Amino acid sequence: MELASFDWWFFFFRWIHVISGIMWIGHLWYFNFTQTPTMPKIPQELRPAVVRYILPEALFWFRWGAMATIITGLIVAWIGGFLLSAIILGIGQHNLHDTMIGFGMWLGAIMWFNVWFIIMPNQNKVMGVTQATPDEVNAARRVAGLASRVNTLLSIPMLYCMVSLHYIGGP
């Protein structure tokens, strides 16, 4: 496999896409299945340490994992020659591979939007990065939590669509 070949770049970006996706969805599931249910059990005087030290670091990797995943996913689809067909869900092409990967891409795009434009702005209020009143912080906590739960639910069909394409056939 030549370094300049499309096959090499397809492999490289697909691998980065998988690693980034693990980083993103791993953090998503950590927040929803570990941190959120555990926070009420943490003594009140220790909670600020979690919000000040652990949460910002975890959110950094969560946010940028989402960005790397969507960018490398688009690159993989472009190099693989199925970007446009996947975006239109393979409609009119009778191509189940592009339909499945397209649904996965659209679900991933919705999740990415939630991370960058709903979860993170609200988490910044919770962490005190953005000025907010106590009522705004409570509302931001609820909105970020709801968007995070939506992403957790969307991650299951998204992962199914992304993985199942390998069994349907195609790149």
Report each predicted region and the residues it spans.
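Polytopic transmembrane helical bundles with strong interfacial aromatic enrichment
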Residues: 1-171
